[in-house]
Amino acid sequence: MANAAAQRRQLVPFAALSATYFAHIGFFNPYLPLWLKELGLPIVVISLLTSVQSFTRVFAPYAWGALSDHTGERVRLLRLSAAIALVASLGLWWDGGAWWIGLVLLVLFTHTSSMMSLTEAAMAHLVAGDWGRYGRVRLWGSAGFMLTVFAAGAWFEGHGMRDFPAWTAVTLGGVLLCTWWLPDVREKHAHERAVKEPIAPVLREPAVRWFFASLFFHVMAHFAIYGFLSLYLDALGYSKAMIGTLWAVSVLVEIAWFFAQGRLIGRLRMTQWLVVGGAAAVLRMALTAGLGGWLAAMFIAQALHALTFASHHTACIAMLTQHFPGRLRGRGQALFTVIGYGLGGVLGVL
């Protein structure tokens, strides 16, 4: 009992890190294009600069994951990546043109794109298959995301985009502080065990291959929604306020799912949850494409986010925990990011 209570206390810093990291993402990703536009950059250059994040997701997470498996220093690597990202963000204050911004974003995204995979790997032993506990950690990320989406939107509406670099530095500063709050755990003798646990045999397992294939297509479909839903709804005549409301619906149901998943997730096997998430995604895309002009259908489509993202994400983490234990954990989490949010994300927005 005392050990369980201690583990719950150790998860509090991970919840704080999830909140601050997604608070950073919640303002940075939506408003980066608007800041670049205010700088006077052409749309083609803006498109190239915003694609840097997807590019880094193809290589950076696996490099960081392999290094964390080799050293066992997942928390220290999180602190290092957060510190470098914060220092890199200071370059956004200097007006060096598009090439300079591209370089700054490359360094910044190289060190932030792997943070969640490293975090998931670091806290895996604390969750220990308790997916209700995992959900209560993860919901803080969703809450942080929604908070800064609206707070930053209101701020930029009233003050313009000139404070974008300051928001970047403040939120990354919060991320760095939370990494220093994490329990400083290290997996002992990492180097000796890492060389004995190659990842290739795991990747040859049919279940693992099918898992990553389904992940790729599932995330690719969702990135089409993430990238173009606002433009699509705007073309259908929805107001800006209603577009924001529909986005908020998806985040609210995500938070609700993570809060309640301890009572729900055990009703099906994790592989069955993957099937449910895939079927819900098909329905969500069909409603969005076929009935986009009907507001009720769009509310239903956005509410399906609880299944197409939240439950699917938990099932994915459970599958990774099962197939990539111990010294394989960092690389497994990294492959999840690379295949899903790197390759799948890039192709999803093309």
Identify the function of each model-found stretch.
Residues A4-S54, V208-L246, H313:
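Helix-loop boundary and gating motifs at the non-cytosolic
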Residues R76-L90, Q272-L287:
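Structural signature of the two symmetry-related core transmembrane helices
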Residues M1-R8, L182-L215, A235:
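Juxtamembrane intracellular "pre-TM" segments in multi-pass secondary transporters
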Residues D163-W180:
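Symmetry-related core transmembrane helices of the 12-TM Major Facilitator Superfamily/SLC fold
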Residues S113-A128, S311-F324:
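Intracellular juxtamembrane helix-capping segments at the cytosolic ends
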